[in-house]
């Protein structure tokens, strides 16, 4: 590990140790009323958003805690311990608000003994780096919208998004340092893996967000414009570590994402009966072709900066 990376690592570990958000994720005493009384049009999609968020946060907690338990390196143990702490705190905070909706999410299945699938560390680095950074971009974009238009803040949880997303950003910085400390992860055939994970994360978000039209409407956000803004922020941040980037400004990128979303909607409407029906098989093939088109679009080459730490300035 180079001296530059070591110095930056020590600075980042100090930030984790200070734990500036230790008291942030608490529901205030003056916010104990029931906040589940929201517009019926947005109710289901907002609840789905909360449930998917708590599942994601708790999954991250389980992953990081498991890695901490298995690694031998003291630096890694400290890092994954800090990140598991943060993810657990986020999940617990969402759960405080879900109680208003009389919803208890049973996440015990994530911790029960099961057969583990082992992935090479590089795959975890690529995927979790992107997950944390795109999480930052998503939360800060929503926060800036309700900060600018307070009348759109239909639930108090949005007030926490600014500091919340800074936790996500800091986690991403840790993975950036890990990858920059090992140049082999960022060249050769690994460039194809980086491109694959970029596309998989972006495409998943695009498809999912277009299934929540009323939630975005309540925030006066177009799902497409919101997603493209998030992609722009994530792409800009990713320049710190990825030598290859998606050309999100290429008109064919958005065109194929829209087609991917449309085909996915068609697949869901076809139901689960006759899972191997001709119609469903055709849709699966079309989805695969569409994703392949996106993958083989020309990428952008990015020269990695020497000073690669990024500040959450969006």
Q: What kind of feature is each model-predicted range?
A:
Residues 1-314:
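Non-heme di-metal
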């Amino acid at each position: 590990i180079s001296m530059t990376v070591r110095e930056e690592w020590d600075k980042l570990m100090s930030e984790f140790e200070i734990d500036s958000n230790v008291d942030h994720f608490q529901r205030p005493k003056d916010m104990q009323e029931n906040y589940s009384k929201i517009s019926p049009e947005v109710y289901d999609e907002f609840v789905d958003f909360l449930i998917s968020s708590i599942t994601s946060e708790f999954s991250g907690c389980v992953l990081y805690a498991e890695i901490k338990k298995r690694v031998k390196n003291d630096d890694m143990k400290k890092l994954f311990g800090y990140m598991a702490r943060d993810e657990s705190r986020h999940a617990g905070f969402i759960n405080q608000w879900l109680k208003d909706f009389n919803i208890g999410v049973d996440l015990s299945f994530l911790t029960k003994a099961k057969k583990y699938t082992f992935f090479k560390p590089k795959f975890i680095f690529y995927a979790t780096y992107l997950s944390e950074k795109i999480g930052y971009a998503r939360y800060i974009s929503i926060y800036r919208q309700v900060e600018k238009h307070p009348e759109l803040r239909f639930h108090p949880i949005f007030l926490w998004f600014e500091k919340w997303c800074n936790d996500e950003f800091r986690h991403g910085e840790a993975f950036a340092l890990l990858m920059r400390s090992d140049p082999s992860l960022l060249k050769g055939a690994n460039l194809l893996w980086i491109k694959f994970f970029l596309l998989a994360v972006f495409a998943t978000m695009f498809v999912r967000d277009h299934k929540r039209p009323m939630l975005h409407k309540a925030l006066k956000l177009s799902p497409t414009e919101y997603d493209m803004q998030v992609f722009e922020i994530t792409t800009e941040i990713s320049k710190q570590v990825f030598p290859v980037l998606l050309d999100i400004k290429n008109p064919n990128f958005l065109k194929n994402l829209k087609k991917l979303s449309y085909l996915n909607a068609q697949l869901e409407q076809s139901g689960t009966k006759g899972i191997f029906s001709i119609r469903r098989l055709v849709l699966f093939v079309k989805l695969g072709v569409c994703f392949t088109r996106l993958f083989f679009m020309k990428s952008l080459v990015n020269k990695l900066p020497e000073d690669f730490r990024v500040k959450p300035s969006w």
